[in-house]
Amino acid sequence: MSDTSSLDALIQALRRLPGVGVKSAQRMAFHLLQHDRAGAQVLSQALAQAATQVRHCERCHTFTEGAVCETCLDPARDATRLCVVETPADQAAMERTAAFKGLYFVLMGRLSPLDGVGPRDIGVHNLLERASDGVVQEVILATSFTAEGEATAHAIGEALKRRGVHVTRLARGVPVGSELEYVDLGTIAHALADRR
């Protein structure tokens, strides 16, 4: 289809997004071209600008436009506490709680031997260096509670402990506002074991 090669290219480009299949990509492309060409231009410009301007923070690896992100530069943050998260989205979730006032280290992934993702790929060497700088007193492992997230937390925790760093892990438990009968058994078991 030479007369729709631009449309096909747009659909294929949209399919690169996580969770977007052919049908969703087509729907988005058709919407932008049929109903929101101005929005398509805004999206195109924002994407191009982000692709050239956004990079990784030299200290925590999150996304930033400067060499060091605003969180790392904030003198009000508690530099003795370092929270390790998998993604910038996880960091944003932690920030929305307003409960953590320390600094972060964003792995930009998690260990996954089956996918060829090892410690070097997620910056564990940088994390170990930063956590051993003499300023950090506690590293909070806030990786997800999936098999890969648990493996990542375990590997990092063991490496940090060998360096004499105090390591804690986010607690697991029953979500606030949930009814016990609807909570999965694994969550109940962990909540019971980790009770205080």
UniProtKB/Swiss-Prot annotation:
Keywords: DNA damage, DNA recombination, DNA repair, Metal-binding, Zinc, Zinc-finger. GO terms for molecular function: DNA binding; zinc ion binding. CDD domains: TOPRIM_recR. PROSITE patterns: TOPRIM. One of its GO terms (biological process) is DNA repair. The keyword rRNA-binding does not apply. A zinc finger (C4-type) spans 57-72. Residues 80-175 form the Toprim domain. It comes from the Bacteria. It holds the Pfam family RecR_HhH. PANTHER family: RECOMBINATION PROTEIN RECR (PTHR30446:SF0). NCBIfam families: recR (TIGR00615). Belongs to the RecR family. May play a role in DNA repair. It seems to be involved in an RecBC-independent recombinational process of DNA repair. It may act with RecF and RecO. This is Recombination protein RecR. The gene is recR.
